[in-house]
Amino acid sequence: MTEALTHVIDHEGQGTPATVRLTVLPSGHTRVGVTDPDPRVPPLLPGPAGVTDESGRGLALLDAPAPRWGVEQRGDRRAVRCEPAGEPPLDDVRTPAAPAVRSGR
């Protein structure tokens, strides 16, 4: 999601309000979203960026680790969301045990 946040700063300006939302889905997986005040929705995958291009890679970079993603217009705002691949449902995540405490000698 750093790409989505960087996009807000680069194209809307530093200090532009953006919302980052983490949602736990009924499946236990996580959805991550960034909403910003730009209502324009970019082409979903505009094609590969050139080696020397300084922009145009954001959605392609998002597509690699998150095969489930999208961009939608919400009135005068845009929302980019993704669901990272391979993420275990929360009920499968194990909490590590507390470290052992030794008494001093």
Curated annotation (Swiss-Prot):
Looking at the record, which segments are called Disordered?
29-55, 72-105
Which residues fall in a compositionally biased region of kind Basic and acidic residues?
72-81
- GO BP of this protein: negative regulation of DNA-templated transcription
Q: Which GO terms describe its molecular function?
A: sigma factor antagonist activity
What name does the UniProt record give this protein? Uncharacterized protein SCO4941
Organism the protein comes from: Streptomyces coelicolor (strain ATCC BAA-471 / A3(2) / M145)
Q: Which domain of life is it from?
A: Bacteria
